[in-house]
């Protein structure tokens, strides 16, 4: 797969899964890699340095992906060969302990932002380009204290399906990747982090937990011409974990 030296955008692209995606797309030929991030300037600079070493030009955009200003700044660095919405946030609480502001914050960044990115970036994207959203198993399975994030990921997958149909006449593919349990800093927000990792390690049929590079490989596939007829789908990358009752 080659991105023909085009620019790509990865939100939440400076750490964990996002950084792995950015580096993978750079290895596939992306000339400029725009990285969105909310905080941790040191991690952003480290990711930028790794991209330079890989031969790509990094562009760092700091801010909340749910912000119209940030989305407009992302669009200004296009046109893109691929837009990957990996950024995610949320409040990890039981349903009855959540507040309306938690809902607005989580849904805005995780789901609405993909629609905002499509409105801002898709008009300038060429046929053969891709939009990819990164989801999680919580979109279809009930995870402890995950009501807000799980609902937002279900919404993201729905947005993916609608965009896939509406953008098909432009030749733009839209899909999602749903990652299993991945040991990144994002898991630090879960009070049952160690239990989740232990369960994933012992119950995953593939014999190991998912790594960021596994997710990046799936995203790269969806951004490639090989995925020409894959539209509006959510590709599950979990080593078979979700197949078990």
Q: What are the roles of these predicted feature ranges?
A:
Residues 14-15:
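Conserved glycine-rich cofactor-binding loop
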Residues 30-46:
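Conserved glycine-rich Rossmann-like NAD(P)H-binding loop of the short-chain dehydrogenase/reductase
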Residues 94-95, 99-107, 196, 200:
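Substrate-binding pocket helix/loop in short-chain dehydrogenase/reductase
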Residues 118, 152:
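Active-site helix of classical SDR
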Residues 141, 220, 231-245:
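Short C-terminal tail/terminal secondary-structure segment
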Residues 168, 173, 230-232:
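Short, small/polar-rich loop/turn modules that mediate ligand/substrate recognition or access, typified
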Residues 204-215:
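A conserved structural motif in NAD(P)-dependent oxidoreductases
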């Amino acid at each position: 797969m080659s991105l023909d030296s085009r620019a790509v955008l990865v939100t939440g692209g400076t750490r964990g899964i996002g950084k792995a995606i950015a580096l993978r797309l750079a290895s596939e030929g992306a000339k400029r890699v725009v990285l969105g991030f909310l905080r941790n300037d040191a991690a952003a600079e480290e990711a930028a340095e790794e991209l330079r070493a890989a031969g790509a030009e990094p562009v760092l955009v700091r801010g909340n992906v749910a912000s119209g200003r940030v989305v407009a700044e992302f669009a200004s660095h296009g046109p893109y060969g691929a837009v990957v919405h990996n950024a995610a946030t949320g409040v990890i609480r039981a349903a009855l302990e959540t507040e309306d502001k938690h809902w607005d914050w989580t849904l805005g960044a995780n789901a609405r932002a993909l629609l905002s990115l499509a409105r801002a970036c898709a008009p300038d994207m060429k046929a053969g380009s891709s939009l990819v959203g990164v989801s999680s198993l919580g979109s279809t399975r009930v995870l402890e204290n995950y009501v807000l994030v799980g609902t937002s990921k279900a919404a993201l997958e729905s947005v993916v399906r609608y965009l896939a149909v509406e953008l098909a006449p432009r030749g733009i593919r839209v899909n999602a990747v749903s990652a299993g349990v991945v040991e990144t800093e994002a898991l630090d927000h879960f009070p049952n982090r160690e239990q989740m990792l232990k369960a994933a390690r012992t119950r995953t049929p593939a014999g190991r937990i998912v790594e960021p590079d596994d997710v990046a490989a799936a995203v790269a596939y969806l951004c490639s011409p090989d995925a020409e007829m894959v539209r509006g789908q959510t590709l599950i990358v979990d080593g078979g974990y979700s197949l078990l009752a």
